[in-house]
Regions:
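Glycine-rich nucleophile elbow surrounding the catalytic serine of serine-hydrolase chemistry
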Residues: 107, 188-198
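Alpha/beta-hydrolase fold nucleophile elbow
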Residues: 179-190
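Catalytic-loop region of hydrolases
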Residues: 24-95, 99, 110-113, 261-266, ...
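Short beta-strand/loop motif that positions the catalytic acidic residue
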Residues: 398-401
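Cap/lid segment of the alpha/beta-hydrolase catalytic domain
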Residues: 103-181, 224-225, 232-235, 357-379, ...
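Histidine-bearing beta->alpha loop at or near hydrolase active sites
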Residues: 431-444, 476-477
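Conserved alpha/beta-hydrolase "acid-adjacent" motif
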Residues: 407-411
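A catalytic-pocket lid/entrance helix-loop region that shapes and gates access to the active site
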Residues: 198-200, 205-307, 435
Length: 501
């Protein structure tokens, strides 16, 4: 199977939550010859719709114990080839951990599984049904030569791959160890967050607990990105990196101290009343040190978001306080391909808009309705708010999102959480949302982003300790506080400490 590099921010989010947990691997697995048991998975084991392409022991290295690595391909329907990798450690803790990916997937890495293996988890991963060298360009696998949608692969990517990876993974674990996993958990961010919600909604029996970070759970992430791109591509509206730095400093000057602590992080960007016109150029100012009228207009537009004629959201607002992290997500400041700035919509114009040659410059708020009613939206979006089957079986869901995420909107995740609480009886005992101030997409940003999500999920599922506050720290920084179960947020106090309010 081909391997590709996973988005660094996604890996950082996964590794940060795994690394600090104090729980160690539990009892050793039943006595057996690991090498023989591993080889037998390729030579003798038979799994439905699956070809095991390799199974071999990998020696221990540093913090990783020796493990059996199993690679295979699942072919549930014609045209489908779902690559899977399972890593089965010697010091198995009798649990399984499935890991999501980022972007349009197409990648499986050891790096993503390292911390889980170190703690004794059998890890489960998939390429989501295709190989893809760039996280934002889906054209190589999602589009047929005639320009039509490659529906088998798009459905694999949307939900089928992660489910089949899980069911097969449980069988592989049981075959290798001679015992079923006592618990199965899932962790992912971005696309991985969407996959986590998809599991909760479509396949509620797969996992005992799910961590879904910054979920790109509807195509509004892509439509929002496209509308923002067009706002900054208007004549005279382009922003350069120095403009973003200028705006960031002005926002903090206007709003930072109002949340109880002038620490470089806005606790709740929604409360910030910064007005872009305060940076408008006056006579004699250098263009890099101020904003021209078109730039002010574009900035106001992305701060406010856009709506359809019906009043429904077309583009979520970009929240204030995270401007220093906008570079990758604003067309004028990024040198990448168009997909980098529109969330990959450029390559999927055919499946989304019914026209493979659609001019994206003509994308408007009303085009959003066509995207949201497309066939792809029907299989891709994880927007079901009634998650009763998952809740009834005792499943636990931790949602989290950085408040400075310039990709999928934090507000969209809050919107989903609040709707699910209303739609699902007793979900308040099965679901938590944590909003992390100053944290960008799946990690990074100015706020503390090292949070032990997996330990929190284990404590909830295995010890009935529902998470309410979780310590958050930042590498090479003294800035730290507890992230709080929403709607509470960490708030600065007069003594320099923070509390959840």
């Amino acid at each position: 199977m081909k391997r590709f590099t996973l988005c660094a921010s996604v890996l950082a989010a996964i590794s940060a939550s795994l690394a600090g947990s104090a729980q160690q691997a539990q009892a050793q697995t039943p006595a057996r010859n690991s090498a023989e048991a591993c080889a037998a998975l390729a030579q003798n084991a038979k799994f439905p719709q699956t070809t095991v392409t390799s199974a071999a022991m990998v020696p221990a290295a540093r913090a990783i114990p020796a493990y059996c690595e199993v690679q295979g391909v699942i072919r549930p329907v014609p045209g489908s080839e779902i690559g899977v990798v399972y890593r089965l450690p010697e010091n198995w803790n009798r649990k399984a951990l499935a890991l999501g990916g980022g972007g349009w997937m197409g990648n499986v890495t050891l790096q993503a599984a390292t911390e889980g293996l170190g703690r004794g988890y059998a890890t489960l991963q998939t390429d989501a049904g295709h190989a893809n060298g760039t996280g934002f360009d889906a054209s190589a696998w999602a589009i047929n030569p005639d320009g039509s949608a490659n529906k088998p692969k798009l459905e694999d990517f949307s939900h089928r791959a992660i489910h089949l990876m899980t069911t097969l993974g449980k069988d592989v674990v049981k075959t290798y160890y001679g015992a079923a996993a006592s618990r199965a958990y899932y962790q992912g961010c971005s696309t991985g967050g969407r996959m986590g919600l998809m599991e909760v909604q479509r396949y509620p029996d797969d996992f005992d607990g799910v961590i879904a970070g910054a979920p790109v759970y509807t195509l509004q992430t892509q439509t929002s990105a496209q509308l923002r791109t067009l706002a900054f591509e208007a004549p005279g509206a382009r922003l350069l990196p120095q403009h973003l730095s200028l705006i960031s400093k002005a926002v903090l000057a206007a709003c930072d101290a109002k949340d109880g602590a002038a620490d470089g992080v806005l606790r709740d960007p929604r409360a910030c009343d910064f007005e872009p016109a305060t940076l408008a150029c006056t006579s004699g100012q250098a263009a890099e040190s101020c904003l021209m009228p078109a730039q002010v207009t574009a900035l106001r537009k992305v701060y406010a978001g856009e709506k359809l004629a019906s009043g429904a959201i077309a583009s979520y607002p970009l929240d204030k306080g995270g401007e220093s992290g906008w570079v990758r997500f604003v067309a004028a400041t990024a040198a990448g391909d168009p997909g980098t700035n529109s969330g990959g919509m450029f390559a999927l114009r055919g499946p989304l808009l019914g026209d493979a040659n659609f001019d994206m410059a003509g994308f408007t708020t009303e085009t959003v309705a066509k995207v949201r009613s497309s066939w792809l939206a029907g299989v891709y979006e994880a927007k079901e708010t009634n998650i009763s089957p998952f809740v009834r079986r005792g499943g636990k869901l931790i949602l989290w999102h950085g408040f400075s995420d310039p990709g999928p909107s934090t507000r969209g995740t809050i919107e989903y959480y609040e709707a699910a609480l209303k739609a699902t009886p007793r979900s308040d005992a099965a679901m938590r949302l944590f909003v992390a101030p100053g944290v960008a997409h799946c990690g990074g940003g100015t706020g503390p982003d090292r949070i032990e999500w997996l330990a929190a999920l284990e404590n909830w599922v295995e010890r009935n300790q529902a998470p309410e506050e979780l310590p958050a720290t930042k590498a090479n920084s003294t800035l730290a506080w507890n992230v709080c179960a929403y709607p509470k947020l960490p708030t600065g106090q007069a003594d320099g400490k923070y509390s959840c309010k």
